[in-house]
C-alpha cells in the first residue's frame, strides 16, 4: 500500500472515516501515514494549488488534528484557517484504541511536528524544489541525516523512547558486487560513490553487507522501520 498520503489533498474528515473503516475490516492493522506533500506534480494532477510550504504545513497540521479527534470517542468541533468542523462524531470508530500515525518529512518544521505528534517518524530528503533532482541527493548524506535525526530527538523530549524511527531506501541493489554497482550508479547520478555506501537512503551490496549496515544504522540513528519499494521486495528477501 501507500506509505504516506498527502494530507492537504484530502478532506481530513472523509479520510478519517475511510481509515477507521479499514481498521475495522483489517481487525486493527491500519497505520496512518501522512505528509504535507512536496511534489508539484501531485498537486497539478489533483488540481490543487501548490501553496507556499508554510501554508501547506499549516493545512497539514490542522488536518492532522481533525483526523486524531475523529478517531476518539465523542463529538468534537475544530475551527481553523483551513478547516471547520462542528459537533462531529465520526463513525465508524477504529478497532485500535490508538491508531499509529507515521509522519514523514525532511525539513525542520515538519520533523518537529512529527517529533511531537507521530508514533513513527519518517526521515526524508529535503525536497524544497518540488521535484526529484540534485538537491535531494545533497540531503541524503549521513551528515544531513544526523541533522534531521537531531531535530526529532530535540523535539520529542521525554516521548523519544516511544517513537519508532523510519526511513525509505530509495536506492536498492542486492548484489555480491556492491562496489561495482555503487560505482556505476554514482556515475549515472553524478554523486559521490562514498555517499552511496554511507547514506541510509541507499542499500547496495550483498545480503551480509546490508544486514550489517542496517544494524549499524539502527544503532546510530534508531532506524528500526525500513521501507523498500515494491519493485525491490523480492530481491531484498535474502536480507530479511
Place the predicted regions along the sequence by residue.
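Active-site-adjacent structural elements that line small-molecule/cofactor binding pockets in enzymes
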Residues: 1-240
Amino acid at each position: 500500500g501507500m506509505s504516506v498520503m498527502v494530507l492537504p489533498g484530502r478532506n481530513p474528515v472523509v479520510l478519517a472515516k475511510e481509515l477507521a473503516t479499514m481498521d475495522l475490516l483489517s481487525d486493527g492493522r491500519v497505520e496512518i501515514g501522512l505528509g504535507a506533500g512536496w511534489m508539484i506534480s501531485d498537486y497539478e494532477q489533483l488540481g490543487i494549488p501548490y501553496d507556499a510550504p508554510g501554508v501547506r504545513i499549516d493545512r497539514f497540521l490542522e488536518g492532522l488534528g481533525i483526523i486524531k479527534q475523529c478517531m476518539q470517542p465523542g463529538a468534537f468541533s475544530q475551527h481553523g484557517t483551513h478547516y471547520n468542523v462542528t459537533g462531529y462524531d465520526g463513525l465508524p470508530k477504529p478497532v485500535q484504541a490508538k491508531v499509529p500515525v507515521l509522519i514523514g518529512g525532511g525539513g525542520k518544521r515538519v520533523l518537529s511536528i512529527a517529533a511531537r505528534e507521530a508514533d513513527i517518524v519518517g526521515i526524508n530528503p529535503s525536497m524544497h524544489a518540488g521535484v526529484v533532482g540534485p538537491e535531494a541527493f545533497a540531503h541524503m548524506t549521513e551528515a544531513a541525516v544526523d541533522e534531521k535525526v537531531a531535530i526529532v530527538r530535540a523535539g520529542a523530549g521525554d516521548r523519544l523512547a516511544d517513537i519508532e524511527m523510519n526511513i525509505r531506501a530509495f536506492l536498492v541493489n542486492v548484489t555480491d558486487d556492491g562496489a561495482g554497482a555503487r560505482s556505476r550508479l554514482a556515475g549515472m547520478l553524478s554523486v559521490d560513490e562514498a555517499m552511496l555506501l554511507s547514506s541510509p537512503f541507499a542499500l547496495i551490496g550483498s545480503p551480509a553487507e546490508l544486514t550489517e549496515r542496517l544494524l549499524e544504522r539502527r544503532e546510530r540513528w534508531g532506524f528500526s522501520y525500513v521501507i523498500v519499494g515494491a519493485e525491490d521486495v523480492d530481491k531484498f528477501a535474502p536480507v530479511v
